[in-house]
Amino acid sequence: GTITPWNFPSALASRKIAPALAVGCTVVSRPADQTPLSLIGQFECLADAGVPPGVANLVIGKSRAVADAFFEHPAVRKISFTG
């Protein structure tokens, strides 16, 4: 999972998402509350590029609820957090 900050959201998300996808991992990403549109656009580009559904996933929600789900879900093996 990735949790990105409000400053430089696209650049910081790309640094986390691209390597994970390149080695065959799925990704769940949560943008900052202030800048969700930048990652929505990025994930639309991934879908347009042919990334299959369920491989790159975007979650928009309350910080605490999403963070708790990341930390508690057994399928999440790594978390990259900036901020």
Predicted regions and their residues:
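Rossmann-like NAD(P) dinucleotide-binding subdomain of oxidoreductase/dehydrogenase enzymes
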Residues: 1-83
